[in-house]
Design a protein with these regions (language model features):
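Conserved binding/recognition cores within well-folded domains
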Residues: 119-157
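A generic structural motif
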Residues: 24-33
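Non-catalytic signal-transmission and effector/linker regions of two-component phosphorelay proteins
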Residues: 1-4
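Acidic, metal-coordinating helix/loop segments flanking the phosphotransfer/catalytic sites
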Residues: 17-18, 32-54
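Charged phosphotransfer/docking patches of two-component systems
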Residues: 10-17, 94
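Conserved acidic carboxylate
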Residues: 7
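Alpha-helical interaction/dimerization surfaces of two-component signaling modules
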Residues: 19-23
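CheY-like receiver
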Residues: 52-131
Length: 157
């Protein structure tokens, strides 16, 4: 699983890396983590075609209160299926994720204790694993509705 983290505070970067490493070991899965506090570097990963399944974003980057939300829009533009999770101390911005239309999976407060923090990150990892990685046999369906009855049939049938 490829994870990209945007966090400008070193102590929070270390917390994320440590937490992700612990979860990877517990679950026995390979998690490739890339952490940066620089928006240009972050966007470069995405523009270069690096497909990450899961993104953890701080909202307030270098004093710009909504920069993380703008970055989430950038991610959504380049990868509409990405899983985005906000990890921030700006809990008052939770409702703004709807305004920016970024479809965030979760909004994790940095100030929660380490066990709760780890559990929330783990939930995001497990969700990503089950929806994007294990569901590789996704097929196209033909769907139609007739007289109130819905029919869904795989194209290969």
């Amino acid at each position: 699983m490829k994870v990209l983290v945007l966090e400008d505070t070193v102590s929070h970067q270390v917390r994320m890396e440590t937490t992700l490493a612990e979860i990877a070991e517990e679950l026995g899965i390979d998690i490739q983590v890339q952490v940066t506090g620089k928006i240009k570097e972050f966007k470069k990963y995405i523009e270069n075609g690096d497909v990450n399944q899961l993104y953890f974003l701080d909202i307030d980057i270098k004093g710009e209160e909504t920069k993380g939300l703008e970055v989430a829009q950038f991610i959504r533009h380049h990868n509409p299926y990405a899983i985005i999770v906000f990890v921030t101390s700006k809990s008052e911005f939770a409702t703004m994720t709807f305004k920016y239309k970024v479809s965030a999976l979760d909004f994790i407060d940095k100030d929660i204790n380490n066990d709760a923090f780890k559990n929330r990150i783990k939930d995001s990892i497990l969700y990503t694993k089950s929806t994007l990685i294990e569901n590789t046999n996704m097929v196209d369906y033909f769907e139609y509705s007739y007289r109130g009855n819905d029919v869904r049939m795989p194209y290969n049938d």
